[in-house]
Amino acid sequence: MIMSIMKKTLFLLSLLVLMLSQAVVAQSVRQQLLSRLQQLQVHGYMFGHQDDPFYGLTWQWERGRSDVKETSGDYPAVMGFDLGGIEMGDEKNLDSVPFARIREELLAHHRRGGIVTLSWHPRNPYTGGTAWDNQDTIVVQSILPGGLHHRKFLGWMKNVRNFLSALKDEQRQPVPIIFRPWHENNGAWFWWGAKQCTPREFHALWCMLQDYLLSEGFDNLVWSYSPNLDGNCSEQQFLERYPGDDRVDLIGLDAYQWGTEEDYVQQLNADLKMLTAYAVNHGKLLALTECGLKNLPDPTWWTRVLKPQLDRYPLSYFLVWRNAKHEFFGPAPGEKNAVYFNEMVRSDNVLMLKDIKK
């Protein structure tokens, strides 16, 4: 009798341990990436590049190519891709990149040991225009529960779900992803911008997408909230549209130099100082989620302007936008800025792919 009870007890304990271990595995993908990002931050900040393996300054769609790798000898630690168009069921995204190729390159970079981030520029669900169709103030309202286009947007979110569900490694485990929806929402150029919806509507939009994906089992997403460069934003203003500490893992900043160098440096430091204080006090990661100087008219920009500012803050990574024939933000072989880019990434605190491999 006693032996029988002991056997049953041991069996139940073994079953409980198995269930708990399975639960840990199922819930740990996001946390594993968060822990990895925190550990890497001790060594410096990673370099990232948007659409790195798809096209460059002088080439397009050739497999195995990368302007960054051909310039520096290594891939970026972080690669960024965009899902704009997936909501419509399109075969290609808003930059004409086939979604099948995005999936292929995303998984390849994960296998290399790199980190991937996804943004999403969905079309305007009210007018059918682009993400930059920003003339209406009722678009967000129309897709929230009870809104005219809520059912349509549910279908759009399902298309995002379907793409994300196919991002699995060789062991059929979900690939960890930094997910960065609704970026630059403090600006007024997207239909989800500050002049296009109220803070309450924006919160509801964020929660609707996040709750939907969590309900579908996507616990592999590190959620990034990334407003645009302001230069005069207080913590109170930042918090007006911030979804909340329980909904954000990584605080980002999109910060391009469109004006003078002096203005850029002043604005970048003002915003990063405020965001650093908040991130440190609230246990959040911090990154420059988009940045760059279009076409790099000043080749020394990497080492003379950008890096001295980044060195002042506890950043996880910085990501420059894409290289294309009509515009480029990263290095390319033969360009004058390549020398200064290589000088920057050879610094001990700037991490490329080889520096973060497990």
Enumerate the language-model features and the residues they cover.
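Acidic-and-aromatic substrate-binding clefts and catalytic sites of carbohydrate-active enzymes
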Residues: 53-61, 86-100, 228-236, 256-269, ...
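Substrate-binding cleft of secreted/luminal carbohydrate-active enzymes
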Residues: 45-51, 284-358
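Bacterial Sec-dependent N-terminal signal peptides
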Residues: 1-27
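Aromatic- and acid-rich polysaccharide-binding/catalytic face
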Residues: 81, 238-265, 321-323
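Alpha-helical scaffolding within the catalytic cores
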Residues: 31-33, 59-68, 100-104, 160-163, ...
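Aromatic-lined carbohydrate-recognition surfaces of secreted/lumenal glycan-active proteins
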Residues: 48-50, 180-182, 206-236, 283-297, ...
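N-terminal module-boundary/linker segments of secreted carbohydrate-active enzymes
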Residues: 26-78, 84, 92-96, 306, ...
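Substrate-binding cleft of extracellular glycoside hydrolase catalytic domains
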Residues: 88-218
